[in-house]
A protein has these predicted regions:
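General detector of N-terminal leader/presequence modules that precede the first folded domain
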Residues: 1-97
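Local cysteine-cluster metal-coordination motifs and their immediate loop/turn environment
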Residues: 69-84, 137-152, 179-182
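Ferredoxin-like iron-sulfur electron-transfer modules
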Residues: 131-135, 160-182
Length: 182
Protein backbone atom coordinates (compact mmCIF):
# COMPACT_ATOMS: atom_id res chain seq x y z
CA UNK A 1 0.00 0.00 0.00
CA UNK A 2 1.26 3.44 -0.87
CA UNK A 3 2.10 5.69 2.10
CA UNK A 4 -0.16 8.48 0.81
CA UNK A 5 -3.42 6.63 1.49
CA UNK A 6 -2.94 6.29 5.27
CA UNK A 7 -1.89 9.95 5.50
CA UNK A 8 -4.92 11.02 3.49
CA UNK A 9 -7.17 8.79 5.60
CA UNK A 10 -6.08 10.44 8.82
CA UNK A 11 -6.49 13.97 7.44
CA UNK A 12 -9.36 13.51 4.99
CA UNK A 13 -11.61 16.26 6.37
CA UNK A 14 -8.77 18.78 6.24
CA UNK A 15 -7.93 17.80 2.66
CA UNK A 16 -11.55 18.21 1.54
CA UNK A 17 -11.72 21.70 3.04
CA UNK A 18 -8.34 22.56 1.49
CA UNK A 19 -9.44 21.31 -1.96
CA UNK A 20 -12.57 23.47 -1.89
CA UNK A 21 -10.62 26.49 -0.61
CA UNK A 22 -7.81 26.25 -3.16
CA UNK A 23 -10.08 25.49 -6.08
CA UNK A 24 -11.64 28.92 -5.74
CA UNK A 25 -8.32 30.28 -7.03
CA UNK A 26 -9.24 28.88 -10.46
CA UNK A 27 -11.71 31.74 -10.77
CA UNK A 28 -8.98 34.38 -10.55
CA UNK A 29 -8.05 35.87 -13.94
CA UNK A 30 -4.28 35.34 -13.99
CA UNK A 31 -3.81 32.15 -11.97
CA UNK A 32 -7.09 30.43 -12.83
CA UNK A 33 -5.93 28.41 -15.82
CA UNK A 34 -2.73 27.36 -14.04
CA UNK A 35 -4.73 26.29 -10.98
CA UNK A 36 -7.15 24.32 -13.16
CA UNK A 37 -4.23 22.62 -14.95
CA UNK A 38 -2.60 21.66 -11.63
CA UNK A 39 -5.88 20.41 -10.16
CA UNK A 40 -6.58 18.28 -13.23
CA UNK A 41 -3.04 16.84 -13.17
CA UNK A 42 -3.37 16.02 -9.48
CA UNK A 43 -6.80 14.41 -9.93
CA UNK A 44 -5.57 12.32 -12.86
CA UNK A 45 -2.44 10.95 -11.23
CA UNK A 46 -2.83 11.24 -7.46
CA UNK A 47 -6.37 11.36 -6.12
CA UNK A 48 -9.80 11.39 -7.69
CA UNK A 49 -12.96 9.47 -8.32
CA UNK A 50 -14.72 7.41 -10.93
CA UNK A 51 -18.43 7.68 -11.49
CA UNK A 52 -19.85 4.15 -11.36
CA UNK A 53 -23.20 2.51 -11.89
CA UNK A 54 -25.10 0.63 -9.22
CA UNK A 55 -24.22 -2.59 -11.06
CA UNK A 56 -20.50 -1.70 -11.06
CA UNK A 57 -20.69 -1.03 -7.32
CA UNK A 58 -22.34 -4.41 -6.71
CA UNK A 59 -19.67 -6.24 -8.73
CA UNK A 60 -16.90 -4.46 -6.82
CA UNK A 61 -18.55 -5.39 -3.52
CA UNK A 62 -18.87 -9.03 -4.65
CA UNK A 63 -15.14 -9.12 -5.44
CA UNK A 64 -14.06 -7.51 -2.14
CA UNK A 65 -12.92 -9.64 0.78
CA UNK A 66 -13.67 -7.18 3.56
CA UNK A 67 -15.97 -4.20 3.69
CA UNK A 68 -16.54 -1.48 6.25
CA UNK A 69 -19.23 1.16 6.47
CA UNK A 70 -18.48 4.68 7.60
CA UNK A 71 -19.53 8.27 7.12
CA UNK A 72 -19.30 10.01 3.77
CA UNK A 73 -16.60 12.58 4.44
CA UNK A 74 -17.98 15.08 1.94
CA UNK A 75 -21.38 15.09 3.60
CA UNK A 76 -19.82 15.08 7.06
CA UNK A 77 -17.74 18.17 6.26
CA UNK A 78 -20.12 20.25 4.15
CA UNK A 79 -23.62 19.41 5.51
CA UNK A 80 -25.41 20.72 2.39
CA UNK A 81 -28.36 18.32 2.69
CA UNK A 82 -30.18 15.94 5.00
CA UNK A 83 -29.38 12.67 3.24
CA UNK A 84 -27.87 9.85 5.34
CA UNK A 85 -24.20 10.24 6.19
CA UNK A 86 -23.32 6.55 6.70
CA UNK A 87 -22.84 5.74 3.01
CA UNK A 88 -19.11 5.22 2.44
CA UNK A 89 -18.20 1.58 1.91
CA UNK A 90 -14.50 1.09 2.40
CA UNK A 91 -12.98 -1.66 0.27
CA UNK A 92 -9.65 -3.31 -0.35
CA UNK A 93 -6.67 -1.11 0.62
CA UNK A 94 -8.96 1.37 2.34
CA UNK A 95 -10.23 -1.19 4.87
CA UNK A 96 -6.85 -1.46 6.57
CA UNK A 97 -6.34 2.31 6.67
CA UNK A 98 -9.76 3.23 7.95
CA UNK A 99 -9.91 0.44 10.53
CA UNK A 100 -6.80 1.94 12.13
CA UNK A 101 -8.20 5.46 11.88
CA UNK A 102 -11.24 4.95 14.03
CA UNK A 103 -13.03 1.79 15.01
CA UNK A 104 -15.90 3.98 16.21
CA UNK A 105 -16.62 5.52 12.81
CA UNK A 106 -16.25 2.44 10.61
CA UNK A 107 -17.78 -0.97 11.20
CA UNK A 108 -17.28 -4.16 9.27
CA UNK A 109 -20.30 -5.15 7.18
CA UNK A 110 -21.33 -8.07 4.98
CA UNK A 111 -21.66 -7.94 1.21
CA UNK A 112 -25.43 -8.24 1.57
CA UNK A 113 -25.56 -5.27 3.96
CA UNK A 114 -23.35 -3.21 1.64
CA UNK A 115 -25.68 -3.90 -1.29
CA UNK A 116 -28.74 -3.09 0.82
CA UNK A 117 -27.19 0.28 1.74
CA UNK A 118 -26.36 0.96 -1.92
CA UNK A 119 -29.92 0.21 -3.05
CA UNK A 120 -31.49 2.13 -0.18
CA UNK A 121 -29.49 5.24 -1.02
CA UNK A 122 -29.83 4.78 -4.79
CA UNK A 123 -33.53 5.55 -4.44
CA UNK A 124 -32.56 9.02 -3.11
CA UNK A 125 -31.17 9.96 -6.54
CA UNK A 126 -27.51 10.01 -5.46
CA UNK A 127 -24.31 9.29 -7.37
CA UNK A 128 -22.05 6.30 -6.80
CA UNK A 129 -18.31 6.77 -7.02
CA UNK A 130 -15.21 4.70 -6.40
CA UNK A 131 -12.32 6.72 -5.06
CA UNK A 132 -8.63 6.18 -5.72
CA UNK A 133 -5.45 7.46 -4.13
CA UNK A 134 -2.19 6.89 -6.00
CA UNK A 135 -3.99 4.33 -8.15
CA UNK A 136 -5.39 2.33 -5.21
CA UNK A 137 -9.16 2.03 -5.02
CA UNK A 138 -10.19 2.50 -1.41
CA UNK A 139 -13.90 3.32 -1.12
CA UNK A 140 -17.27 3.28 -2.81
CA UNK A 141 -19.14 6.38 -1.82
CA UNK A 142 -22.78 7.17 -2.39
CA UNK A 143 -23.05 10.92 -2.22
CA UNK A 144 -25.24 13.75 -3.43
CA UNK A 145 -24.43 16.40 -6.00
CA UNK A 146 -24.58 19.18 -3.39
CA UNK A 147 -21.91 17.68 -1.07
CA UNK A 148 -19.70 15.41 -3.22
CA UNK A 149 -16.34 17.15 -3.59
CA UNK A 150 -15.24 15.39 -6.81
CA UNK A 151 -18.63 16.14 -8.40
CA UNK A 152 -18.53 19.78 -7.32
CA UNK A 153 -14.93 20.18 -8.56
CA UNK A 154 -15.99 18.88 -11.96
CA UNK A 155 -19.30 20.72 -12.34
CA UNK A 156 -18.59 24.03 -10.60
CA UNK A 157 -14.88 24.48 -11.36
CA UNK A 158 -14.34 22.45 -14.55
CA UNK A 159 -11.82 20.05 -13.01
CA UNK A 160 -12.54 17.30 -15.53
CA UNK A 161 -10.39 14.60 -13.92
CA UNK A 162 -11.83 14.97 -10.42
CA UNK A 163 -14.66 12.61 -11.42
CA UNK A 164 -14.52 10.61 -14.62
CA UNK A 165 -16.10 7.56 -16.20
CA UNK A 166 -14.16 4.39 -16.90
CA UNK A 167 -16.06 1.61 -18.63
CA UNK A 168 -13.45 -0.90 -17.41
CA UNK A 169 -13.56 0.12 -13.75
CA UNK A 170 -14.61 -3.32 -12.48
CA UNK A 171 -11.83 -5.02 -14.48
CA UNK A 172 -9.33 -2.44 -13.18
CA UNK A 173 -10.44 -3.12 -9.60
CA UNK A 174 -10.15 -6.90 -10.11
CA UNK A 175 -6.64 -6.40 -11.53
CA UNK A 176 -5.70 -4.39 -8.42
CA UNK A 177 -6.94 -7.24 -6.22
CA UNK A 178 -4.92 -9.79 -8.22
CA UNK A 179 -1.76 -7.70 -7.97
CA UNK A 180 -2.23 -7.32 -4.21
CA UNK A 181 -2.33 -11.11 -3.80
CA UNK A 182 0.94 -11.66 -5.69
Amino acid sequence: MHHTLPFYGWHQHKFLRLYMFLIKLTRLPLVGSLGRYLANSYARSKHGGYLITLEDAEQIIDASNTLALGPCSCRQVFHNCNLPVMTEIVISAGREVYSKKSNKEFKQISKEEAKRILHQNHRSNVIHTIMHCQGLFYAICTCCSCCCVPYRLKKEYNIEYALIRNRNIVADYLKQLEEAEV
